[in-house]
Amino acid sequence: MVWSRGQRRKMAQENPKMHNSEISKALGADWKLLSDAQKRPFIDEAKRLRAVHMKD
């Protein structure tokens, strides 16, 4: 997920003892709190990257 890459890095730096599974759960909860408008740029970028990958 495009959004989670940056967020995961930030959360891991802020919480170095947090396990990856806990980070994933927290990121999932945070993603659900975003509005559709906030999610849109990340969804669009994921679609673009998918299209580029399929083209190769």
Curated annotation (Swiss-Prot):
Q: Which keywords accompany this UniProt record? A: Activator, DNA-binding, Nucleus, Transcription, Transcription regulation
Record flagged with keyword Transcription: yes
**Compartments where found:** Nucleus
Annotated region Disordered: where?
1-22
What highest taxon heads this organism's lineage? Eukaryota
Where is the signal peptide, in residue numbers?
Answer: none
Name its GO BP terms in alphabetical order.
brain development; negative regulation of transcription by RNA polymerase II; neuron differentiation
Do the record's keywords include Ribonucleoprotein? no
Could you tell me which residues form the DNA-binding region? 1-56
Task: Report the protein's function.
Answer: Transcriptional activator.
Question: What is the protein name given in its UniProt record?
Answer: Transcription factor SOX-1
Report the source organism.
Answer: Pleurodeles waltl
Gene name tied to this protein: SOX1
